């Protein structure tokens, strides 16, 4: 494949998404950011982790019907038709994250879509942080391990007109094997969408790890 050797990449920062915000309103915000990126001649645009909804792992949800609303059974191509029309016209590639339900198995997923308006790559988050059960001492939760299964696609790379792309999601960035596996496959550009709270309450059981980090 003929690569574009130099191009502009953009990080599309959505900001907070309210639990009451519908997916259509979020996609409208994504479109506005994409227009801004286009004005700066960006060819690769990276949206955050789980960017179609609020970051629902913060909440303890016991009603399965309410939880199901956050998931997609496939990449929401019809919901994002205006976005895909623009990237098709401008020959762009975007990545974005969403909660995927694959035949009953939930994943924290990120995908690439190019100017063909088709998925050209998919990754499922491997290093899930947080906890599985409700912890009442926390003002908010971090329940990724409850709501998602560990990714089962490895760290693939994708041959595109912008080079060999690879991706990871949020906590994956903290583990050296993420970069090693991608690099050994010839990855040239890695994209990382993440969704990190401003404050995460202390976990006393991790104090010894914090002390270790402080002495590195």
Q: What feature does the model see in each segment?
A:
Residues 1-9, 157-166, 189:
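Beta-strand-turn-beta hairpins that frame and shape the catalytic cleft
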Residues 4-20:
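Generic N-terminal amphipathic, Lys/Arg-enriched alpha-helix
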Residues 9, 36-64, 94-95, 172, ...:
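Active-site beta-strand/loop signature of hydrolases that rely on acidic residues for catalysis
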Residues 14-19, 52, 196-200:
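A short, flexible beta-alpha/helix-coil linker loop
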Residues 29-44, 78-89:
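A short, N-terminal amphipathic alpha-helix
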Residues 61-69, 136-142, 200, 205:
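Short glycine/proline- and charge-enriched loop/turn segments
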Residues 69-167:
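Catalytic-core segment of enzymes that process non-peptidic bonds
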Residues 72-93, 164, 170-216:
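CN hydrolase (nitrilase-like) catalytic-core segments centered on the catalytic cysteine
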């Amino acid at each position: 494949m003929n690569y574009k050797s130099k191009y502009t990449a953009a990080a599309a920062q959505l900001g907070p998404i309210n639990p009451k915000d519908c997916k259509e309103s979020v996609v409208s915000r994504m479109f506005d950011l994409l227009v801004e990126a286009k004005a700066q001649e960006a060819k690769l645009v990276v949206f955050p982790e789980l960017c179609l909804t609020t970051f629902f792992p913060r909440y303890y949800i016991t009603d399965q019907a309410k939880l199901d609303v956050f998931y997609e059974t496939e990449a929401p191509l019809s919901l994002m038709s205006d976005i895909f029309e623009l990237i098709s016209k401008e020959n762009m590639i975007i990545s974005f994250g969403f909660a995927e339900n694959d035949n009953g198995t939930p994943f924290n997923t990120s995908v690439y879509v190019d100017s063909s308006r088709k998925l050209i790559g998919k990754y499922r988050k491997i290093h899930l942080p947080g906890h599985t059960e409700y912890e009442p001492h926390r003002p908010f939760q971090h329940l990724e391990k409850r709501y998602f299964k560990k990714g089962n696609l490895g760290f693939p790379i994708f041959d595109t007109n912008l080079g060999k792309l690879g991706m990871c999601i949020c906590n994956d960035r903290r583990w050296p094997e993420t970069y090693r596996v991608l690099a050994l496959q010839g990855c040239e550009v890695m994209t990382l969408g993440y969704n990190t709270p401003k404050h995460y309450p202390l976990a006393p059981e991790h104090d010894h790890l914090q002390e270790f980090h402080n002495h590195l």
